[in-house]
């Protein structure tokens, strides 16, 4: 009976399998995206599907909700994006683009999956009316203050002119 002395021994194969077993969990962990990475990927998808002329970039990310540990479960997200100066046709990352002055702001909500292999998201974005409403409230308050001030000035002028008119004694 002949033994194989020159071939790989059982000990070497065991060592190789052990190392593979240690490396595989690291590869699986590397495939799970962080909450912010998943949102940035979703924004890339939004930019690809958008018919707008310029790219959008993350302006504000709402706090991460409490989540379970399963990367395959859809996670709720909400964030705000703003139009940049970079055209959609550019090869630049949106993060390398400056925000456009008076650029369009959109509020986005939906879900993302943190498993990088699935790379799935369901996001819808609409014009952020909260900012427009705040601006409208500002102008309404200015109008009220100016209007109230003008009424007071008008009343003082009326009182002053009323005192100038000579009074007749009867």
UniProtKB/Swiss-Prot annotation:
GO CC aspect terms: extracellular space; vesicle
List localization entries.
Secreted; Vesicle
TM region positions: none
Positions annotated as pro-peptide in this chain are 31-131
Q: Which UniProt keywords apply?
A: Antibiotic, Antimicrobial, Cleavage on pair of basic residues, Disulfide bond, Immunity, Innate immunity, Secreted, Signal
Q: Which cysteines are joined by disulfide bonds?
A: 86-97, 108-125
What are its GO biological-process terms?
antimicrobial humoral immune response mediated by antimicrobial peptide; defense response to Gram-negative bacterium; defense response to Gram-positive bacterium; innate immune response; neutrophil activation
How does the record describe the protein's post-translational processing?
Answer: Proteolytically cleaved by proteinase PRTN3 into antibacterial peptide LL-37. Proteolytically cleaved by cathepsin CTSG and neutrophil elastase ELANE. After secretion onto the skin surface, the CAMP gene product is processed by a serine protease-dependent mechanism into multiple novel antimicrobial peptides distinct from and shorter than cathelicidin LL-37. These peptides show enhanced antimicrobial action, acquiring the ability to kill skin pathogens such as S.aureus, E.coli and C.albicans. These peptides have lost the ability to stimulate CXCL8/IL8 release from keratinocytes. The peptides act synergistically, killing bacteria at lower concentrations when present together, and maintain activity at increased salt condition.
Q: Which PANTHER family match?
A: CATHELICIDIN (PTHR10206), CATHELICIDIN ANTIMICROBIAL PEPTIDE (PTHR10206:SF2)
UniProt free text on domains: The cathelin-like domain (CLD), which is the propeptide part, does not seem to exhibit auto-inhibitory function, as it does not inhibit the antibacterial activity of antibacterial peptide LL-37.
Q: What is this protein called?
A: Cathelicidin antimicrobial peptide
Instruction: Write down the species.
Output: Macaca mulatta (Rhesus macaque)
Lineage from the top down? Eukaryota, Metazoa, Chordata, Craniata, Vertebrata
